[in-house]
Amino acid sequence: MNVWVIMNSCKEIQMNNFIEKLKLRSPLIHNITNMVTINDVANIELACGARPIMAMAPQEMDEVTGICDGLNLNIGTPSEERFEAMRIAARMAAKKNIPIVLDLVGVGVSRFRMDFVMSLLDEVRVDVIKGNLSEVKAVMEHGRCDGGVEVTDTADESDAKALACRAALRYGCICVITGETDYVAELCDEADCYDNNESSQMSTDATGTGVMDTGVVNAVASDADGYTHNYRVGSITGGHPMMKRVTGTGCMLSGLICAFVAADCDDKYGAVTAALSSMKSAGGLAASDMAEHGRETNSCHFIKPGNAAYRDRLIDAVYHICDGDYELM
């Protein structure tokens, strides 16, 4: 697939608009997430103003999902019972127009995971699929990614955007590819792409404090049959290398995405971009705060903060961003 950037616009995404909607609605999010990070997912959703529920028994899926505003599915610790719960919950969410986020954690590690994801995507239209480059590529090629759930950044920007566009086209949803730079793509008609763009390229400033530079990048891509399609395509940079030293930052991000989308179903692409930007900003803020605290404690012969302290500060940073303590564009 070839992708050509064809337009730039100065129209800006207003981060605070999405944060305000999140605070006002306080969406109830049903998370069927992995057992390694379940507590952190719940806490980061609470930090942003959402209300998490972590039901997992198949017997209560219809009732629980039916009262929720968003469904967050994560295949990180799979089992037959967990996958059955996800199927039931996804069917109910689709029936009631509840947005679904699917996190492809380790999808290429085993045929068990891949078969479930393929069957779910065949049965239910999800609103957002999210994974690192290897995971999204594995789903698109029905293959394996031998790197486990670790992020691999082996493609250049145009390749990553093209992959995101292909996935968005195939599954009729927003595709997020995470990494040092996050990419987000959505299939749209020409009028939407040119008249209603509200998101796109964002980055933190050099200090990592979360100042956003915004603009719009739209693209046209040709598929394998030569047909052309219009896309909204965005890239978000920032964060901090420490985010890779904490397990579950990707799972937390999925919970955050689901919360933002559930709070603004009318602009899901903008909501996804706002969630990605909030997480990148929080990553930089957490590192800055930890470095400052480390200088203080080092002089007193205390243990300097490490990755556990960083995780706590990351959640705190999301709390303060969504509480309006930091001015974001």
Identify the meaning behind each predicted range.
Residues 138, 245-277:
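Short, small-residue alpha-helix embedded
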Residues 31, 53-55, 100-104, 128-133, ...:
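General beta-strand structural signal in soluble alpha/beta enzymes
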Residues 234-248:
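Short pre-catalytic strand/loop immediately N-terminal to key active-site residues, enriched for Gly-Thr
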Residues 163-164, 168, 268-283:
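Short, well-structured alpha-helical segments that form the helix of a local strand-helix-strand
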Residues 12-102:
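Conserved N-terminal subdomain of the carbohydrate kinase-like
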Residues 113-205, 217-232:
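Conserved phosphate/ATP/ADP-binding segment of small-molecule kinases
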Residues 93, 98-122, 128:
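Glycine/small-residue-rich loop that forms an oxyanion/phosphate-binding "nest" at active or ligand-binding sites
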Residues 281-329:
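Charged C-terminal helix
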